[in-house]
Design a protein with these regions (language model features):
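Active-site-adjacent structural elements that line small-molecule/cofactor binding pockets in enzymes
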Residues: 1-326
Length: 326
């Protein structure tokens, strides 16, 4: 089954007032993207709590989906995550995608006084949390006894609009995380490995084309082990470097400069699925080709923390849609 390409962007990382927030969200929606995404961090440049922000977004948008990208599971008990997520789904008329991850950013954990447990522990806790949340989206009382969470006869309220539950998005970069995502998620975010607790230059090498093919394979292995088919889930990826140029020569010059910083070839950088540089037409063709190669159908355009030009986004979305209709 061939799915259409879809695009997500992040609004500003800070909010100065309701008018600015509302106007930014409406500009994003008008650009033609399919999803607004809010990340979940305490430190660096982040100041917007994602579920609260998406609840506000639900009230001033009509069409776009709303993605938590992604909630760090350690920051909230799954009962609270479920309740807030269910309310966002209701307020939005069924537009929530609930993104969850094991947590990774060491500065967040240190600043909040939280223990950054080993990856295996965090992943097992995430697995339990997702099972609890999925159960709470149902209509029956939930009983759950796990290593990390115990639920006793709790009925999840409010009931979500989307049934059996809003789509579950799980992101990860290593084999264990991507196996887990393949076994449980409706959408799998293929990312760099974040074992170090920070996003550094190593992420560039971890997202080169051969490595991403390996990561996609881990997702499929996890899904197959759980008895799932490839039609049961989608793949998503963040674009960490996006630049739309006026000519291919401008694109080549830009790629050469960036590649030199990391001592890799411009060709290797250009082929990385996390990099999109070229004219609007070339970028559209590249993304469509990557769907064929990797199976990736959802792309976040601004993972590098720069709010994209709405005109550029609209041109890219329109070009992709035109090619898909042809």
């Amino acid at each position: 089954m061939t799915r259409p390409l879809r695009f997500a962007v992040t609004p500003f990382l800070t909010v100065d007032g309701p008018d600015e927030w509302r106007d930014q969200l409406r500009r994003i929606e008008d650009s033609g993207v399919s999803t607004i995404v809010l990340a979940d961090h305490f430190t660096e440049q982040w100041s917007i709590e994602p579920l609260t922000g998406l609840a506000a977004a639900a009230m001033c948008t009509r069409r776009v989906r709303l993605l938590t990208g992604v909630l760090a599971n350690d920051y909230r008990h799954p009962v609270l995550t479920h309740r807030s997520a269910a309310l966002v789904d209701v307020l939005s008329g069924g537009r929530l995608t609930l993104g969850m991850g094991a947590g990774w950013l060491r500065t967040d954990y240190d600043a909040a006084g939280l223990a950054l447990d080993p990856p295996g522990t965090r992943l097992e806790r995430l697995r339990e949390a997702v099972l609890v949340i999925k159960a709470l989206f149902g209509d029956e009382p939930v009983d759950f006894a796990g290593r990390f969470y115990t639920i006793n006869g709790l009925v999840g309220r409010p009931s979500p609009v989307q049934r059996p539950h809003p789509p579950i998005f799980i992101g990860g970069g290593g084999p264990r995380a991507l196996h887990l995502a393949g076994s449980l998620a409706d959408i799998v975010g293929v990312n760099a490995s974040l074992r170090a607790g920070a996003l550094g230059p190593d992420a560039v090498y971890d997202l080169l084309a051969p490595r991403v093919l390996e990561k996609v394979g881990w997702v499929h292995q996890g899904a197959e082990a759980a008895g799932r088919s490839r039609d049961d889930y989608e793949l998503e990826m963040n674009l960490w470097l996006v630049r739309v140029t006026n000519s291919q020569r401008d694109a080549d010059d830009y790629l050469a400069r960036i590649a030199a910083r990391y001592e890799i070839s411009p060709e290797s950088l250009a082929e990385s699925p996390s990099v999109l540089v070229g004219t609007v037409g070339a970028c559209a063709d590249t993304l469509l080709a990557r769907r064929d190669t990797y199976g990736i159908t959802q792309w976040q355009l601004d993972a590098g923390l720069s709010v994209p030009d709405p005109t550029m986004v609209a041109q890219l979305v329109e070009r992709v849609e035109r090619v898909e209709r042809a």
